[in-house]
């Protein structure tokens, strides 16, 4: 189907009302829109995030570290409501000039170290604590291969397929077909890799799995975009096997609900400041 009713202007101008439900999450310029400092809790690591796939990567990693007894990985997870423009506060922009979640401050250093971009945070935590990134050069490189594969693939799955299939106010056949093809190609790449290995980068659970699961694991398990049937997710049997196994890890079950503001109330922990919050402060408890 061809729709030629839209003709781009010679010079694009921003229509603030055109973004619909997403009008407040982005702008064509950078920098803060308002003055507001970020809160700081009691733990060494201060995370400012939202429970999207990119946010889940980091909270899963932190919960995995804590599960190993790494006390230095204790963290406060502060909710950044991107629909309300929290990411454009002066405090947040100071941590991440790109105004995207997640963003991390490590207060074990003076001055604190800022870390932004989810892949960078995973790598920082892996190197800081010495877990989930192999020391062997070949294994480390393979892990990095897949971490960067995800960083390149996620925009096609999320901003491309997820947006036009699930969120866009108008269903555009060309856009959906284009990004569905790429989503399925990426799933096939991952499926073939997992046919040969228990985890994405080999036989070890690494930051590659933590990066990829919130995107591709959630998609095939029906956790995002309501697209599992449309994508014929059941046909990717190796991705299904891996997604279910990783999803059963206790740290993944915890990490995936931190800073989450949608879905079942018992799977929403808006902020995490203590391990006990998983038992006492999920939204079903708070609203019950």
From Swiss-Prot:
- Binding-site positions, glutathione 1: 52-54, 87, 101, 117-118, 151
Residues forming coiled coils: none
Per its UniProt record, what InterPro entries does this chain match? Answer: Glutathione-S-Trfase_C-like, Glutathione-S-Trfase_C_sf, Glutathione_S-Trfase, Glutathione_S-Trfase_N, Thioredoxin-like_sf
The annotated regions of Basic and acidic residues compositional bias extend over: 268-288
Asked if the record carries the keyword Protein transport, the reply is no
Residue span(s) of domain GST C-terminal: 139-265
Where does this protein hold glutathione 2? 26, 178
Q: Which CDD domains match?
A: GST_C_YghU_like, GST_N_Ure2p_like
Instruction: Give one GO molecular function term.
Output: glutathione transferase activity
- For this protein, what is the EC number? 1.8.4.-, 1.11.1.-
- Main EC class the enzyme belongs to: oxidoreductase
A Pfam match is: GST_C_2
PROSITE patterns on file: GST_CTER (PS50405), GST_NTER (PS50404)
Keyword annotations: Oxidoreductase, Peroxidase
What Gene Ontology terms describe where this protein resides (cellular component)?
cytoplasm
Q: Signal peptide: which range, if any?
A: none
Region Disordered: list its residue ranges.
260-288
Q: Which residues form the GST N-terminal domain?
A: 46-133
Additional facts recorded? Binds two molecules of GSH in each active site; there is one tight and one weak binding site for GSH.
Summary of the function given for this chain in its UniProt record: Exhibits a robust glutathione (GSH)-dependent disulfide-bond reductase activity toward the model substrate, 2-hydroxyethyl disulfide; the actual physiological substrates are not known. Also displays a modest GSH-dependent peroxidase activity toward several organic hydroperoxides, such as cumene hydroperoxide and linoleic acid 13(S)-hydroperoxide, but does not reduce H(2)O(2) or tert-butyl hydroperoxide at appreciable rates.
Q: Write down the PANTHER family for this protein, in alphabetical order.
A: DISULFIDE-BOND OXIDOREDUCTASE YGHU, GLUTATHIONE S-TRANSFERASE-RELATED
Q: How does it assemble?
A: Homodimer.
Give the family this protein belongs to, as stated in its UniProt record: Belongs to the GST superfamily. Nu-class GSH transferase family.
* UniProt-recorded name of the protein: Disulfide-bond oxidoreductase YghU
